């Protein structure tokens, strides 16, 4: 009988390492999958809110949008993988969907056993929800490991999500998003906006706070703002902030980061206060050439302050600071760089 084993000295070293990993790892080499589809529907006539709750040991995707009916409709797909199809089906049977009505709120809840047999294993399970609700509802979610894609028109939304990305659009009054390790994208929002995540980015577009305020906070993630009007506070660390086409109105606005850069392109300022803080990073400001504001710029030793395309009447000017007046002092801009960095102010 011929020996079909391959001598190790004929294999590249990297292949030997990979084979060793495959042999030593508890991988499900023969896996079977099972998928089940279902749907549920409940009357939402007279209701004004929707609430979603999912367990910690189940992840997937949620797609929520509005429709013209007076019902809430949920289309549900559950997928599982195990070493046998019978076991995979057993996993899907363990996930229960409950859709009911409690006075003015429609509740959708997914439940699973705890602990579940797929936890800590190489088995897999994933849920996909397609949710349809009436126009101008309020929405509340408490999820983990779900990616959320939510489109209005919705009046108010309150999202709490861990380990998943979030996309929200078309909110008319109030938006509150608390995430962990998830990217957050928000667009077409009116009213107050509060977004907090960590170790990922925040992007907001086409926002008007309507006499309210927007608060954007992350760490180790970039903040992007485009087409904004109102009051804005944005903070991150070790990552840049880029805001363009922004109008700052009646109140305090703050931008903070460290060891990165801040780029602000301001279309208009109306009786607003702008405070920018950075550490060992540059700050670039583009403002209207007819800006009316009091300026105060400070950098650390070795830093630079550059201005162009705008008329400033200086009151203090030295190697590390510039104070001055543009126009009638209707607004205030203060920029402080702790350590070496450059402030550049450009009129357009």
Predicted feature locations:
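Intrinsically disordered, low-complexity terminal regions
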Residues: 2-348
